[in-house]
């Protein structure tokens, strides 16, 4: 869980820095320079991987069997209902964040008339709560069990986002309200995604790479669906985005409780203090 929290920290830095950096590039060199910057950073990444990232697994420990072994691993994972439930829980949570990624600029800039710089700061604040909460996943998991953390955080996230949706449906439409609820909600989401990934991988250590690939693919597929649904109902306000986020949060909560309903007690993923991460 500590390792997953660290990975979430690394992966979450980009959503915080990218809008701020993008607004600065746009203001100084125009929007075309953003794409040139992306291309340049991509080339730097390719060179760094080729030059500075050696293979870490010894030859004897590397997976063998080629395509057949890979397909067999996918078959085993896709037949594991517990794995699928946890993967879908995390994917629904990630989908809610993708809906925010896609719709927040239209809502905060076009609807609430924030400047690009103000939008970048608002986005960073909400993403920061996700990162900070993710760093507590391991500690809370050791104290309460990761299954309890997932159930509680998913429920709190759903309640927070559904409350925000009800306020919008009641006609209360304020940017301060949106930012505040997202700040709290994404804190809970920061507990859900790392914990579900750890629980899903726990029983599949021998095929962790395949399982991780499925988890990542599920998050992006669910995210693309959430973006498409939110975009289909765009009306110039923040309501479609908020409704999509709330729906994803509610679905994640339902899946979490269904997937973990028969599993109680402390989480066995990290029963020993000196378990390697």
Which positions does each model-derived feature cover?
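A late C-terminal transmembrane helix in Major Facilitator Superfamily
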Residues: 199-235, 245
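Helix-to-loop junctions at the C-terminal end of transmembrane segments
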Residues: 133-147
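Intrinsic disorder in cytosolic terminal tails and internal cytosolic loops
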Residues: 259-277
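Juxtamembrane intracellular "pre-TM" segments in multi-pass secondary transporters
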Residues: 56-87
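C-terminal membrane-cytosol helix-exit motif in multi-pass small-molecule transporters
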Residues: 40-59, 255-259
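C-terminal transmembrane helical hairpin of 12-TM major facilitator-type secondary transporters
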Residues: 150-193
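Helix-loop-helix hairpin linking two adjacent transmembrane segments in secondary transporters
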Residues: 6-51
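Structural signature of transmembrane alpha-helices in multi-pass secondary transporters
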Residues: 4-18, 45, 93, 126, ...
């Amino acid at each position: 869980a500590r390792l997953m929290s660290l990975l979430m920290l690394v992966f979450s830095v980009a959503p915080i820095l990218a809008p701020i950096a993008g607004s600065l590039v746009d203001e100084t060199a125009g929007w075309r320079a953003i794409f040139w910057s992306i291309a340049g950073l991509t080339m730097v990444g390719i060179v760094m991987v080729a030059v500075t990232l050696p293979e870490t697994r010894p030859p004897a420990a590397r997976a063998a069997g080629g395509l057949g072994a890979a397909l067999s691993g996918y078959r085993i994972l896709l037949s594991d209902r517990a794995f699928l439930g946890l993967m879908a829980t995390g994917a629904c949570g990630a989908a809610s964040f993708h809906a925010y990624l896609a719709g927040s600029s239209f809502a905060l800039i076009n609807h609430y008339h924030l400047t690009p710089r103000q939008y970048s700061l608002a986005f960073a604040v909400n993403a920061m709560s996700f990162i900070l909460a993710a760093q507590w996943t391991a500690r809370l998991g050791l104290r309460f069990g990761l299954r309890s953390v997932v159930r509680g955080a998913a429920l709190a996230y759903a309640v927070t986002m559904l409350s925000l949706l009800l306020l919008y449906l009641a006609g209360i439409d304020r940017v301060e309200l949106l930012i505040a609820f997202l700040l709290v909600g994404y804190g809970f989401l920061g507990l859900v995604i790392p914990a579900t990934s750890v629980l899903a991988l726990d029983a599949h250590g021998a095929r962790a790479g395949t399982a991780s690939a499925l988890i990542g693919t599920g998050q992006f597929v669910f995210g693309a669906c959430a973006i498409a649904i939110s975009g289909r109902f765009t009306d110039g306000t923040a309501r479609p985005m908020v409704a999509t986020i709330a729906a994803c949060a509610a679905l994640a909560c339902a899946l979490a409780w269904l997937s973990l309903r028969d599993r109680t007690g402390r989480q066995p993923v990290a029963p020993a203090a000196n378990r390697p991460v």
